Amino acid sequence: MVEKFVSAERPQTEEGMQYHIACKPGDVARYVLLPGDPERVPKISSLWDEAREIAFHREYRTHTGKYKGVPISVTSTGIGGPSTAIAIEELAAIGADTFIRVGSTGAIQPGIEIGDLIIAKAAVRLEGTSKQYVRVEYPAVADLEVTLALIEAAESLGVRYHIGITASTDSFYLGQGRPGLNGYFPSFARNLVDDLRQARVTNFEMEAATLYTLANIYGLRAGCVCAVFANRVTNEFGKAGEKEAALVASEAVKILAEWDEEKERAGKRVWHPGMRG
């Protein structure tokens, strides 16, 4: 039997099952973690009190459960802006409103070690997806509450972290200042790392700019925490900090849930513990 979708504009079934992520209303919590790799989904959800697999369709794998009593979900986005935009569009359509990217990154500033975490307060829009949503001058910035929750979580867990501006690209190689094949290394790529380093950009990854742009224009909340796998200053590469990033993101959700309850009781539009009477 062919599954019936009710619209070509927003493909979904009558019960709201989304075309790409294969999730419907009620399947995900309002707080969703966003790794790129589907294999990271069970690694992240294994840190929670409980979790179950909701769907695994294409690159989109979703688990929903609870972390320290707070409903939470995780959905993989695949690599880059296009698939990330699809995930955000469809997750928001079924009730999610707060997103934290949990990924890996390459650092370009000195003093950042393999396994450290970087919390991105903003993103340079070097990718193309966000440009199909809004003018290039539009800033890609993280939500203040989410960023503060990530910082508080990192502090409470005692992990090494940095706060900075990421550069989101569509290319892992030339787009991040790495040489291509057969000696292809044009000047715009050769100079990219130095130019961004002078501008105090901290790292490269491939999804935050799309996430931040869409979250802001749609009235959602978003933040990003990444483990440093590559150090472009020392030319080192190693997979470290993945668990710590997942724990910080999960703990940030618990903190946000507490703040959201306090915010509602106080009748405020934004919240931070410093606003307690």
UniProtKB/Swiss-Prot annotation:
Pathway(s) the chain acts in: Pyrimidine metabolism; UMP biosynthesis via salvage pathway; uracil from uridine (phosphorylase route): step 1/1
The reaction(s) annotated as catalysed by this protein in its Swiss-Prot or TrEMBL entry are: uridine + phosphate = alpha-D-ribose 1-phosphate + uracil
Can the keyword Nucleus be found in this entry's annotation?
A: no
Q: Which Gene3D superfamilies match?
A: Nucleoside phosphorylase domain
CDD domains this protein is in? UP_EcUdp-like
* Top-level class of the enzyme under EC nomenclature: transferase
Q: Which GO terms describe its molecular function?
A: uridine phosphorylase activity
Main localisation: cytoplasm
UniProt keywords (A-Z) are: Cytoplasm, Glycosyltransferase, Transferase
Query: Which stretch is the leader sequence?
Result: none
Gene Ontology CC annotations of this record = cytosol
Q: Which domain of life is it from?
A: Archaea
Q: What happens when the gene is disrupted?
A: Disruption of the gene results in a complete loss of ribose 1,5-bisphosphate generation from uridine.
EC numbers, comma separated: 2.4.2.3
Look up the record and give one Gene Ontology term from the biological process aspect: nucleoside catabolic process
Q: Which protein family is named in the record?
A: Belongs to the PNP/UDP phosphorylase family.
What the protein does comes down to: Catalyzes the reversible phosphorylytic cleavage of uridine to uracil and ribose-1-phosphate.
PANTHER family from the UniProt entry: URIDINE PHOSPHORYLASE
Q: What is this protein called?
A: Uridine phosphorylase
